[in-house]
């Protein structure tokens, strides 16, 4: 109920913002946590994450992101979207641990449903999606990148990408595991998931987690040039092929959404898991201090 109400309010606000005039040849609409720059003549929109300090996937961010994506999917002038961070250095730190710690089961269920929705909307989108990974991308940040049709990462050894949930004492959901296996292969995914491996750019390229590694100042220009190449393919044939390749993986979640929510809620509510999250959060506080 709360998520649906938030979606209605944000859609109304987004509609008002979407009617503003063009700015420097690009139309923008924005909410607190996502900035969208539309380049209608090129058929491209750029979605920039702006949820400081680390672009964590809070419930509010997830809601605003899905609404922004929905607006773009309904815009006939847009054929592709580039996902990136407004703040270089951090693509997204992933799921917001504060949404999973010290809350009640109803909140955990609402949050996990929003996480599922993010993945499904991105994974099944008819738009061409390219991630311009201009910073660290662990866990949920990697989730968003994995849904894209093409991934470009900045060549900076300080940046890493991967699903490191096991290091936090939690487990990646089966549908994200499937996405990972489809991307880097079963054995590489099995090893990386158990160890919580975070890959620097060169290693991410080697295992197939990203498609290109480029100098940091060329990430966005490369994303645009790659998008232009994808635009040479007729939309209908590309979309049908994408659906054919991804439908079985997505259906695996769609058929089990409620069970997955219940499993997550039960798992995250365990005392042992809450204690693990508490320890991890305390370590983060000490690092900041």
Curated annotation (Swiss-Prot):
GO cellular component labels: mitochondrial matrix; mitochondrion
InterPro entries: ClpP/crotonase-like_dom_sf, Enoyl-CoA_hyd/isom_CS, Enoyl-CoA_hydra/iso
Keywords per UniProt: Acetylation, Fatty acid metabolism, Isomerase, Lipid metabolism, Mitochondrion, Transit peptide
UniProt xrefs under SUPFAM superfamilies: ClpP/crotonase
Site feature (Important for catalytic activity) residues: 165
Positions of modified residues (N6-acetyllysine): 48, 76, 222, 229, 255, 283
Chain positions with N6-succinyllysine modification: 48, 71, 222, 229, 255, 275, 283
Keyword presence, Mitochondrion: yes
GO MF annotation: an example: identical protein binding
Annotated Gene3D superfamilies: 2-enoyl-CoA Hydratase, Chain A, domain 1, 6.10.250.170
EC number of this enzyme: 5.3.3.8
UniProt pathway: Lipid metabolism; fatty acid beta-oxidation
GO biological process: fatty acid beta-oxidation
Family affiliation: Belongs to the enoyl-CoA hydratase/isomerase family.
Function: Key enzyme of fatty acid beta-oxidation. Able to isomerize both 3-cis (3Z) and 3-trans (3E) double bonds into the 2-trans (2E) form in a range of enoyl-CoA species, with a preference for (3Z)-enoyl-CoAs over (3E)-enoyl-CoAs. The catalytic efficiency of this enzyme is not affected by the fatty acyl chain length.
Quaternary organization: Homotrimer.
This protein's name: Enoyl-CoA delta isomerase 1, mitochondrial
Record organism: Rattus norvegicus
């Amino acid at each position: 109920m709360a998520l649906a109400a938030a979606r209605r309010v944000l859609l109304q606000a987004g509609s008002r913002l979407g009617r503003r005039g063009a700015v420097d040849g690009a139309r923008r609409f924005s909410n607190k946590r996502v900035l969208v720059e539309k380049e209608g003549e090129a058929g491209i929109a750029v979605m920039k994450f702006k949820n400081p300090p680390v672009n964590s996937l809070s419930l509010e961010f997830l809601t605003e992101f899905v609404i922004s994506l929905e607006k773009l999917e309904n815009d006939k002038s847009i054929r592709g979207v580039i996902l990136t961070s407004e703040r270089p250095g951090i693509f997204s730190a992933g799921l917001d641990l504060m949404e999973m710690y010290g809350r009640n089961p109803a909140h955990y269920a609402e949050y996990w449903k929003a996480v599922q929705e993010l993945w499904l909307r991105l994974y099944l989108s008819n738009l061409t999606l390219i991630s311009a990974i201009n910073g660290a991308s662990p866990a949920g940040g990697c989730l968003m990148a994995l849904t894209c049709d093409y991934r470009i990462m900045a060549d900076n050894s300080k940046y890493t990408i991967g699903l490191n949930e096991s290091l936090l004492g939690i487990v990646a959901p089966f549908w994200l595991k499937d996405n990972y296996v489809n991307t880097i292969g079963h054995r590489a995914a099995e090893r990386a998931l158990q160890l919580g491996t975070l890959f620097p750019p060169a290693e991410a390229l080697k295992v197939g987690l990203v498609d290109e590694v480029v100098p940091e100042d060329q990430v966005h220009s490369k994303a645009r040039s790659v998008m232009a190449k994808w635009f040479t393919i007729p939309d209908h044939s590309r979309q049908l092929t994408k659906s054919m390749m991804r439908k079985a993986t997505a259906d695996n979640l769609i058929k089990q959404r409620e069970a997955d929510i219940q499993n997550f809620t039960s798992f995250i509510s365990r005392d042992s898991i809450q204690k693990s999250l508490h320890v991890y959060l305390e370590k983060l506080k000490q690092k900041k201090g």
